[in-house]
Amino acid sequence: MKILSYLNVSNVDDIESDSGYIFNYTIAAEFLSKGIEFDIIVPQELSGKLNKISSGHQHFIKMGHTKYEVRYNFAWTEVKKLIVQMHPDIFFLNQAELTSHVKALLVETGLDKATKIVSYCHYPALHISAMGETCVDSSLDNGGLAEDIIGNLYSAVNIADLFFVQSHFAKQLLENYANAIGYKLKKEIMVLPPPYDNRLFQAPNNAKKKNTILYNHRLYDSYGTKEFIEFVKKNQDLVFLVTDPMMNRGTDRSRYNISPMTNRLALQELDNVKILDGSNRMDYIQAIDSCKIAIAPYRRACVWSMAVIDCFCRGLPVIGPNFASFNEIIPDFLRYETVSKERLLVDKLLREPDFWMDSVYSCKLLLKRISPSTIVEAIMYQIDRIM
């Protein structure tokens, strides 16, 4: 079997911390170990930089960089050339908004029956309003584009042979909004969490743990960073370590949203916060190891958090709010409804060794369900069903 995967890259400047890249090199290794040919289409700027993926399985083309380019730019001629050369059995599309482009290309080449499209939606352009209703994500609505992006995702559900999202919460978001606008989904949205990154287990753990609280998420306003800043301000007796994966963010991306820079500057003003560059993977892992607990993002529409899973892999318990996909990721006794309960959980984890150990154990239980081999087996099961 031949699989041709189209990479989604949201962070070309810091590729080591890009979730789409991590997802693809993780499943690529598993597919190749099973004797399945797995090639990846990647942005040409990354030529020579992707040492986690065999060079014989990389194809470099011109792709988008910004959040809109990646959703609208499609190198038709270059992708067509690869498909005609390879005749893949599966086109694994990690930028689901481009599904209709791929389908049209397959129709034109006469390969629409031979090549199946598997679309993986890494990020639905939806959010939760203050009233608790599903709404468009304002961070993807510059110029009113969010509705079109969502429409392309719904088109992908109906066109792709398989359409995956990361969590039941992500599926619920898409289905709820489709019902709200009267859009008929003709096919099933399937749930498939991203696998954990094997490198998190392979790295040695030499760091000495301190009573420090880790926050290892992007600093967008939409991630709830301002709520985190308020929590830090109200708890000056606690020490926080923030790993920012976007310190090298390019100006072409920053002009759409300056909140990561604004929030980073606000955190730098606080005496109980230290900020590290989270884009280097080994430095990032050492930062996780040095902390006692971690806090999930405060994002009300969080469809998954690979950063939370990173902590689980390194034996670090994570607390988080009792909403969104955290109900599927974080043990119930580590979720909170109020800021006061959040503080109580922090104190308990810092002061009670037995509770901390029980929390580590419970967090690690999830990992059995999302190992790379388990996730690839689940993908193969669904692929076999449509072939």
Give the location of each predicted region.
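Active-site proximal beta-strand in glycosyltransferases
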Residues: 90-92, 108-145
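Membrane-proximal helix-turn-helix segments that form the acceptor-binding/catalytic region
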Residues: 125, 139-163, 262-263
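Donor nucleotide-sugar binding/catalytic pocket of nucleotide-sugar-dependent glycosyltransferases
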Residues: 158-202
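Conserved donor-binding/catalytic core segment of Leloir-type glycosyltransferases
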Residues: 164, 205-223, 229-235, 241
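Nucleotide-activated donor-binding/catalytic signature segment of Leloir-type glycosyltransferases, i.e.
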Residues: 254-285
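Acidic donor-binding loop of glycosyltransferase active sites
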Residues: 289-303, 316
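Short hydrophobic beta-strand element within catalytic cores of glycosyltransferases
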Residues: 313, 317-320
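A charged, aromatic-enriched C-terminal amphipathic alpha-helix characteristic of glycosyltransferases
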Residues: 353-386
